[in-house]
Amino acid sequence: MSNPNEMTDEEIAAAMEAFDLPQPEPPSTPQAATATDGTLAPSAPAEPSHSASPTLDALDESRRPKAKTVCERCPNSVWFASPAELKCYCRVMFLVTWSSKEPNQLTHCDGEFLGQEEG
């Protein structure tokens, strides 16, 4: 009897084929602003709504840091949440850099560049 947590060869093949599928087109939204001549005015580019953390992306906006912190986009940050608290652990400095009980607004840090190869 096989382990229900293991994928079959067919499931793996189907998952690999999904990588070759084209990305879906984002839904088009009408521009709200119009220029004085009646044509549509270009809109300002939207700020990305997601961070480098799936944990932060999954949380309601009310649970995320109010003041932006560099840790939100850092690949060395490990965000974790409980029903009562949200914390960020830094794998470079080996400490909790942010928590909902003790928010610390780090705005700049060299840690986000460690491990990146120069091109």
UniProtKB/Swiss-Prot annotation:
Annotated region (Disordered) at 1-67
Composition bias of kind Low complexity appears in: 41-54
Which keywords does this Swiss-Prot/TrEMBL entry list? Conjugation, Plasmid
**Protein task:** The initiation process of transfer DNA synthesis requires the interaction of at least three plasmid-specific components (TraH, TraI, and TraJ) at the transfer origin resulting in the assembly of a specialized nucleoprotein complex - the relaxosome.
Q: What is this protein called?
A: Protein TraH
What organism is recorded for this protein? Answer: Escherichia coli
Q: What is the lineage of its organism?
A: Bacteria, Pseudomonadati, Pseudomonadota, Gammaproteobacteria, Enterobacterales
Q: Which gene encodes it?
A: traH
